[in-house]
Amino acid sequence: YCVVEQSQMERAIQNILVNAIRYSPSGELIRIALSETHGTIRGEIENTGVRVPDDAIPHLFEAFYRADISRNRNTGGTGLGLYIVHKIMKMHHAKYGISNTSNGVRFWFELPCRQPIDNSI
């Protein structure tokens, strides 16, 4: 199992999903994947559509930063969503990042988990 602050983790995942939807063409699918390996939960949320300029990726988790993407003119937002994700992931000692794919963007995180409690003792 993973120990998380539920409301904070819900907020982080919601912010990631909102961005994935916001920057995908209407009707496109959002891919969500979760897996567990060696006590770590890995999550990936991937969209198709607008890719992020490579020079903007290191700044996406900064407060009020918005990449120079023409679609930004048509989308709402304050530039705080990924900054909030950054703070919540750091709080949970998670590794995380964003990368471009061949046809979109992938957000990933690796959340360290504790070993399950042995109730047989």
Question: Where do the PLM segments sit?
Answer:
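Short alpha-helical Gxxx[C/S/T] motif in the catalytic ATP-binding
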Residues: G76, G81, V85
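Glycine-rich ATP-binding loops of the HATPase_c
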Residues: H93-S99
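Conserved micro-motifs of the catalytic ATP-binding
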Residues: Y1-V4
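A residue-level detector for a conserved hydrophobic packing site
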Residues: M9-E10
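Short beta-strand/loop element within the Bergerat-fold HATPase_c
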Residues: G27-G39
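Short helix-loop "hinge" at the ATP-lid/N-box region of the Bergerat-fold HATPase_c
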Residues: A20-I21
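Short conserved segment of the HATPase_c
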Residues: V52-F64
